[in-house]
A protein has these predicted regions:
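Intrinsically disordered, low-complexity regulatory regions of eukaryotic regulatory proteins
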Residues: 1, 23, 101, 154-156
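Short acidic/His/Gly/Ser-rich catalytic and metal-binding motifs that mark active-site loops
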Residues: 1-4, 129-131
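Flexible, surface-exposed loop regions and adjacent strand-edge segments
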Residues: 3-12, 55-60, 93-98, 135-143
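Gram-negative outer-membrane beta-barrel transporters
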Residues: 7, 11-89, 127
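Outer-envelope beta-barrel architecture signal
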Residues: 34-36, 61-63, 72-74, 100-102, ...
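C-terminal beta-signal and adjacent terminal beta-strands/loops
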Residues: 87-88, 108-157
Length: 157
């Protein structure tokens, strides 16, 4: 950001530069038993300008664990995702606190005539964390929504 605002939104100035990127992405999936599956994953990127300094809006280290159950017509899962603090920031960019998201869902599949329907309940951000996504242009003014719950039916015709 240039510290200049127009209609209450920050004005940005971009210029091209050579960068050095290092990172990793890993995923481990374990079918614990027939209905249960555990997934562990993580990713990280380190982005620096070739002449020194950090690239703006670089995502922080992220790690996640998901336990899923699927048997016959029933599916359920619970996922915890931890986003670490991002303090490797560019000039005029603010650091972002880390946060943990906890999401869960359960669904039941059934047939109605020739259509297959799925009834579900899902919850996102169950711990009602204040979430500011470091890669967002509006992170300092607009957090993600808090806890949400949804109940629905999805159909294939």
């Amino acid at each position: 950001s240039t510290d200049v605002h127009e209609d209450e939104l920050p004005v940005y100035l971009f210029s091209a530069a050579e960068v050095i990127l290092h990172g990793f992405e890993a995923q481990f999936v374990w079918q614990m038993s027939d209905p249960f599956k555990l997934t562990l994953q993580g990713d990280y990127i380190r982005a620096r300008l070739n002449g020194g300094g950090d690239l703006p809006r670089t995502p922080p280290l992220r790690v996640a664990a998901e336990l899923a159950y699927e048997q016959d017509a029933i599916s359920a899962d619970m996922r915890a995702t931890r986003y670490m603090q991002q303090d490797k920031t560019a000039a005029l960019e603010t650091a972002t606190d880390g946060y943990t998201l906890l999401d869960a869902s359960i669904s039941y599949r059934f047939n109605l005539g020739t259509s297959q329907l799925t009834a579900y309940v899902k919850g996102q951000n169950l711990t009602d964390e204040e979430v500011r996504v470091h890669t967002s242009f509006l992170k300092d003014s607009t957090p993600l929504p808090g806890r949400s719950m949804a109940l629905g039916v999805r159909g294939s015709f």
